Curated annotation (Swiss-Prot):
This is Protein-arginine kinase. PROSITE patterns: PHOSPHAGEN_KINASE, PHOSPHAGEN_KINASE_C. The gene is mcsB. ATP binds at residues 27-31, 89, 123, 174-178, 205-210. It catalyses: L-arginyl-[protein] + ATP = N(omega)-phospho-L-arginyl-[protein] + ADP + H(+).
Amino acid sequence: MSLKDLINKNLSHWVAGQGPERDIVLSSRIRLARNLDTIPYPNRADKDSKEEVTKRVLDATSKQGKIKLHYIKMDDLPEVEREVLVEKHLISPAHAKAGEGKGVLLNDNETISIMINEEDHLRLQVLIPGLQLEGAWETASELDDLLEEKLDFAFSQKWGYLSACPTNVGTGLRASVMVHLPALNLTNNINKMLGAISKVGLTVRGIYGEGSEYVGNLYQISNQVTLGHTEKEIIANLKSVTSQIIEQERQARNLLLKEKEIEVRDRVNRSFGILSHAYQISSEEALRMLSNVKLGIDMGIITDVDTGVLSELMVLIRPAHLQKLEGKELTPTERDIKRAELIKTRLNM
């Protein structure tokens, strides 16, 4: 596969597309947890039960007619292909691990994914670029309604939608945004902001969800609970907090230009120099340097590189994407070399 093919055909819309506040908010995500009534949850289900879930879901999605979805059986994919789906945020790391009955449904531009037999029978996700929580919710809600016409979801009048995880009981809704906050980090305000978020019913994770590290100044902010709040309330709260975070990040960027312009320009250009000339580079270092360069582009320090290229590289430099591009398994050192080559090539395209 050529670099051009990988970029043009294998980048999800949330990476390559445009959206409101895109310089700070990389993506908006809505995820709904649903289970079929009378069938055990995946962690207690046998092979036949999981196959029955898959059969019912595929039958329901094929009959809804409005949204074209393609089914992928996880056991049919080699490990690197499963990891590519994780790196594109289309499936969870847990879903990529070997196990019977697992599958995923995707639409053409990968804004919609439905994991089958993950922690719940269905994890329906809509992922789009920029701050578009309402738009993502509208799409997710429409598909949820279409599926509920064909499937009997486990639902309690008292508790709402039932889930294998207590924190998902209620609406089953997890709304999240992925944000790039380098200036808050550079002005030493990031910990204060993260602490404030936890006090308003939200949580902050790394870019791959629970248990993942913060890298490249990227943070995933989402609601903590789904019980006792309507979907609109959850989304409105997250959007309001995100808007405040955006404003704080913009103020921090202005402060840096006003009080530390030389230091910021030096950091940005040093990072660009490393990315442009490194012979090998680790994923962690590359993400740090890309974060600095993206900040420089967004602040007008670098003017001859499209900020979209930086967003693309944040995905393309991951281990599975590099190995898919090369068409073979790579050692860590080989990945570091190929990562440096890819970055140099892409920055000069």
